[in-house]
Amino acid sequence: MTGFRDQLGVHAQALVLRETRNNLLTSNIANAATPHYKARDIDFGAELARASGTGTLRTTEARHFAVGGPAARGEALYRDPVTPSLDGNTVEMGVEQMEFAENTLRYQTSLALLNRRISGLMTAIKGE
């Protein structure tokens, strides 16, 4: 028998990560005029793999290197600008708005899939 969390699949984890990414992107947009502000983001694919356990690497020998770094620990990374500004701010409004719109659409999709999954579970529980 599997647990409730297993029944929700990856959608619940994706929803949490999309919300985290949305917060970072809105912070970037809000600080577009702040001198020396560095735009931040997460590597969604890597974070989802880490959260779902599919991205773990196994070492088979003592001489293997451990994988680390900010992305492996779930930290926000700084984005390198295509055209840096003179005041040191790395926010590129067009990039941020596009990433925000895409992330919001994917958040809504994950939410709809999660709602459908929960509705299916409720139907199974009620025996309808």
Swiss-Prot record:
Instruction: Determine if Membrane is one of this entry's keywords.
Output: no
Any one cellular-component term (Gene Ontology)? bacterial-type flagellum basal body, rod
* Keyword set includes Aminoacyl-tRNA synthetase: no
Q: What is its main location?
A: other
Which domain of life does the UniProt lineage start with?
Bacteria
Q: Where in the cell is it found?
A: Bacterial flagellum basal body
Q: Which family does it belong to?
A: Belongs to the flagella basal body rod proteins family.
Annotated function: Structural component of flagellum, the bacterial motility apparatus. Part of the rod structure of flagellar basal body.
Record-linked NCBIfam families:
FlgB
Per UniProt, subunit arrangement is: The basal body constitutes a major portion of the flagellar organelle and consists of a number of rings mounted on a central rod. In Gram-negative bacteria, at least four rings, L, P, S and M are present, whereas Gram-positive bacteria lack the L and P rings. The rod consists of about 26 subunits of FlgG in the distal portion, and FlgB, FlgC and FlgF build up the proximal portion of the rod with about 6 subunits each.
Q: What is the protein name stated in its UniProt record? A: Flagellar basal body rod protein FlgB
Origin species, per record, is: Cereibacter sphaeroides (strain KD131 / KCTC 12085) (Rhodobacter sphaeroides)
